[in-house]
């Protein structure tokens, strides 16, 4: 009983912390500005510009002091009196500041959790760096995989209710509810639903979405690990989560009453593995398709009865790993059969044994990557390199270093690919795009520019990756031939977005 209570225990030691007054502190908006700087592989670092200037922030805080937005009515004249002509700008600044404030609260929860629990309990707090080694080790022993698209249309009240479990400051929750309902049209869309793919206020909406996913995964992992004991567990230990046990019991009971009258341990699968990144998750298992279908309908009931979200069974696809390729984190991953020949000789008899083994293979999806290059004006939609407009005051070395940086980041991120042919094509596009950009700057032809610069210019794009990786792995990667044979996962978590978001 105590074990279950600790699994979903909420940190109540800081429940009297008040987050609402932080909205009146200028340094909060400075933090939002600093965190908002875009670290992108295919584009320059872009900040908020003048949107978060100290004058605008001070003016906003002054108006918030003069008239509390929590007591606003739905009258447009009162809203316009507060925001004036900068309604869109002020709403964006407040949303970014609110995201920073609530993230501070979640960071305190994490620190408190790590202080009270031993480090071994935090094995579920894994970064994306552990995903590919996990797939490499585990997927070769699994048989079936479910590619799940997590519902991203969430009602506003569900978001506020989810945050209520973690944030005990009523003023902040009232502000959040008011802010979402009153300024939803300004923020994203007339519909009262949040979507993961919103372009404006990404920090604010990604926080709301991730908090909702965190709640979903906590319930999912609890029911997954403790399902065999749910029937004998008292509902009193879940008092902190409103109607939690009733909803879980109903979701599981509906599923089992429609199929078998059996005990819940039949539902427990020790070989079930779960991986998620953003709006996509993968559940893989070694067992039969029957159990995978049971998990499928269980997830549907979980979303419908616990989160009140319409979730169609068609959003969960069950496939055999040997016949299916996963598009995940900028890679196209699959299981391929790799044959190995073993020769054994005893006296004069020579035996040759050919073994076929499953091997995790990851390839670079060239079409989506060319689409990203096209959006960044390095190539057209067909993959033909084009010149990129640059500032007239930029030097040749700055332009070359920028292209080299992009090539290096792409090579590092896709260093775990088993086939480098697509990566070579991308580097070829960037190399010629750099040549065309420099020729355009000097107003000369490409052939003339190459004659002036010599062959050493193109060699920089080929040697850059070898030099950097040889510093990282000096012993393993001794020759260039071996460099491209081995798989090494060198992910940059700060520059990942362009490679995994092809929308």
UniProtKB/Swiss-Prot annotation:
Ranges in a coiled coil: none
MF annotations from Gene Ontology: RNA binding
Keyword hit for Chloroplast: yes
Keywords, comma-separated and alphabetical: Chloroplast, mRNA processing, Plastid, RNA-binding, tRNA processing
InterPro entries cross-referenced by the UniProt entry: Domain_X (IPR024937), Maturase_MatK (IPR002866), Maturase_MatK_N (IPR024942)
A biological-process GO annotation: tRNA processing
Subcellular locations according to the entry: Plastid, Chloroplast
Top-level lineage group: Eukaryota
GO CC terms in record: chloroplast
Pfam families the record matches: Intron_maturas2, MatK_N
Alphabetized PANTHER family for the sequence: MATURASE K
Family: Belongs to the intron maturase 2 family. MatK subfamily.
Summary of the function given for this chain in its UniProt record: Usually encoded in the trnK tRNA gene intron. Probably assists in splicing its own and other chloroplast group II introns.
Protein name: Maturase K
Gene transcribed to yield this protein: matK
